[in-house]
């Protein structure tokens, strides 16, 4: 049996149950484990309590329980420069960004990995629900987590082969209830802590309120694609393609009582387009353009492949044909897709293997671009 005690694994510990169990399992498997708490955002909750301080206390309690050293490292500047500025720029451009994808790419598997290597790490580990499979020739494949409901490969799709080579996902073969049960059996301080929701730096706060602190809202006209005035919107950045709530128009307009949805945006004119019906014609597209396309292993500069794709988290896979040129791709859908949203990720799969992905730029219907920006 190999001696794991000579293999140093640095675990990103958030103060949550998933990363706590990650550290516990690695320690039980005999690895030389170090816990690191990343402080990425300077924040207090509505009661004036610094949430990072509370989370760090939980990390300290768990690390003491399982007997591993732990440290805190501050990545606030890197986070602001590499994730938050991107997040704001995307909203300014009328898009709907996915900061978790960028946070994994730039912070958890870049800034954190670089820091871990200075501590002599052989690997880093996180509490993500994903799996890595290592070939004999050293190539690493990223597979979906066993818990379909928790699988996080969508958010990890921008990781490189070099990053995956250095990564372990000890929870990948477990389902969430099993992870909680392990934490409770071990009496970990975080066993009953509820999962965090929302964007990492916003936490539980009101999204609209938070965004308006950084981007001035520009109210404008809300109308149908036929040109009928439907009142005023609060600012394009507050709406995403396919959204239903928050429009304030109910069923009072139009002959039928079908609900209203965001069906388009015109950033240059500051117009929000709305229409009735979940499957409104303007919400259905047949292809998309993506940029920043990246694969987890080396691929040819230009190629075409058939695979499946996700266009948002927790969505069932859809069959697609992908034509790649450099870091751009055209993705044609076997069946029309609803609410393909610029700024979100498109992620490619071959069975359970996550191949990589890109960021959605434009959606098309039978070759015609849909006005989503």
Swiss-Prot record:
UniProt-annotated catalytic positions: 103, 200
Please give the catalytic activity noted in the UniProt record: S-sulfanyl-L-cysteinyl-[protein] + uridine(34) in tRNA + AH2 + ATP = 2-thiouridine(34) in tRNA + L-cysteinyl-[protein] + A + AMP + diphosphate + H(+)
Alphabetical GO biological process terms:
tRNA wobble position uridine thiolation
Query: Which UniProt keywords are listed?
Result: ATP-binding, Cytoplasm, Disulfide bond, Nucleotide-binding, RNA-binding, Transferase, tRNA processing, tRNA-binding
Q: State the protein's purpose.
A: Catalyzes the 2-thiolation of uridine at the wobble position (U34) of tRNA, leading to the formation of s(2)U34.
A GO molecular function term, named singly, is: tRNA-uridine 2-sulfurtransferase activity
The record ties this protein, via PANTHER family, to: MITOCHONDRIAL TRNA-SPECIFIC 2-THIOURIDYLASE 1, TRNA 5-METHYLAMINOMETHYL-2-THIOURIDYLATE -METHYLTRANSFERASE
Localisation: Cytoplasm
Q: Which residue ranges are recorded for the region named Interaction with tRNA?
A: 150-152, 312-313
The UniProt record gives the binding positions of ATP as 12-19, 38, 127
Q: Per the record, which residues fall in region Interaction with target base in tRNA?
A: 98-100
Site (Interaction with tRNA) found at 128, 344
Q: Which family does it belong to?
A: Belongs to the MnmA/TRMU family.
Provide the protein name: tRNA-specific 2-thiouridylase MnmA
Offer one Pfam family short name for this entry.
Answer: tRNA_Me_trans_M
Q: What is its EC number?
A: 2.8.1.13
List all disulphide bridges recorded for this chain: 103-200
Cellular component GO terms, alphabetical: cytoplasm
